[in-house]
Curated annotation (Swiss-Prot):
Enzyme class: isomerase
EC number(s) reported in the record: 5.4.99.12
Membrane-spanning intervals of the chain: none
Ligand binding (substrate): 109
Designated gene of the protein: truA
Catalysed conversion reaction: uridine(38/39/40) in tRNA = pseudouridine(38/39/40) in tRNA
Organism: Shewanella denitrificans (strain OS217 / ATCC BAA-1090 / DSM 15013)
Annotated family: Belongs to the tRNA pseudouridine synthase TruA family.
Gene Ontology molecular function: RNA binding; tRNA pseudouridine(38-40) synthase activity
Name this protein carries in UniProt: tRNA pseudouridine synthase A
Key words of the record: Isomerase, tRNA processing
Amino acid sequence: MRVALGIEYDGSSYCGWQRQVEVDSVQAQLEKALSLIANEPIEVVCAGRTDAGVHGTGQVVHFDTTVIRPDSAWTLGVNANLPDTIAVRWVKLVDDSFHARFSATARRYRYVIYNHKFRPGLLRHGLSHYHGDIDETLMHQAAQQLLGEHDFTSFRAMQCQSKSPFRSVHEVNVTRQGMYIMVDIKANAFLHHMVRNIVGSLLEIGLGNQPLNWISKLIAVKDRRQAAATAKPNGLYLVDVTYPEEFAIPKLALGPLFMLD
């Protein structure tokens, strides 16, 4: 039997999604709680592995099990055994052909910037603080140069293990709500650090340090060293994963909760 779950988590206290030796991860905590409910070892597969300090409101996982439990066990029961920073949002029995990673057709991330002279006292782990005068309209205009399929070598981490640097960006928008600026980007898949590297370069344009066409130049040059520094992890959220309609995967509000959809 294959089970899919929707997972929300605050990644600030974890080494990232992926299970690792001697350090705590979201995956390790989730598998521990699931194994307690199933009374057998459970291993999960996720839609997208997030880095240390990165959050998720729309992470999707699947696992296989031989035991039958009511939906309440996989939600309320698992949540009772999880730390407060991780929560199951929904559960669905799925066909064995469903795969959380390989069945996905798109992923969507949101990066939230707190643009204010002074650092925040609340939500400090869920925002990235930048105090300069940021022009979000310039950032949005520049971001449109990312649309379509490109070689994103300039925006991939040096240690990225992906065989191909090509990715297809479907949508990208930069909006402001008061002191909050949100970069919202959807693509078929993302390279390691791709979103944070894109945000770092868009910020340079928004701050007036680079021209509007800089993104196109960076795409063309295919050199990570030419782009801006990687943006901080704490403002980044995996908010949605898209699957073919045949799987009927539940859809919730994108989040994060303090931002309007």
